[in-house]
Amino acid sequence: MGSAQLPLQTKGIFHSLPTFSPDVKALTAIVTGANGISGFHTMRVLLESPKRWEKIWAVSRRPPPEEMMALLPEDARQRVEHVACDFLSAPEDIAKQLKDKGVTADAIFFYSYAQPRPEPGAPVWSNAEELLDTNCERST
């Protein structure tokens, strides 16, 4: 199917999203950093398509706060399951946590990152290079 049949769309803060064929159904997604701004909004967009995205695994150290989950309709909340996972742990420990919960996925949306402490008195993003180095090192 070409782009004429599946045009791009905008959903909230997300632009140029593809439109997917309605034939694709019952997918499962992992959203890491699900209690952050980008992770939570990605989860909201996925949950707007209940036939396509049957289950969302919200993977983060803490579950999304109740105030955030209250923004979702009840039927959407029923399709979200939190998995407590610290991505600073050893890869074997992360794998065990996911496996023990029975997590499987058709797609992964990765929004987790480690924020190094800035120098005292410096703005939070003043150590952008250290932020990049820390997170690139964790993902290799």
Task: Annotate each language-model stretch with its function.
Residues 139-140:
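Conserved internal alpha-helix within the Rossmann fold of NAD(P)-dependent oxidoreductases
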Residues 5-52:
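N-terminal Rossmann NAD(P)H-binding glycine-rich loop of SDR-like oxidoreductase domains
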Residues 59-63, 87:
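N-terminal Rossmann-fold cofactor-binding loop
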Residues 54-57:
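Conserved beta-strand positions in the Rossmann-like core of class I SAM-dependent methyltransferases
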Residues 32, 59, 109-113:
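SDR active-site strand-loop-helix element
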Residues 68, 74-135:
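NAD(P)H-binding glycine-rich loop region in Rossmannoid oxidoreductase-like domains
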Residues 1-2:
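Universal eukaryotic N-terminal targeting presequences
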Residues 36-37, 63-64, 114-117:
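Short, solvent-exposed loop/turn segments at secondary-structure junctions
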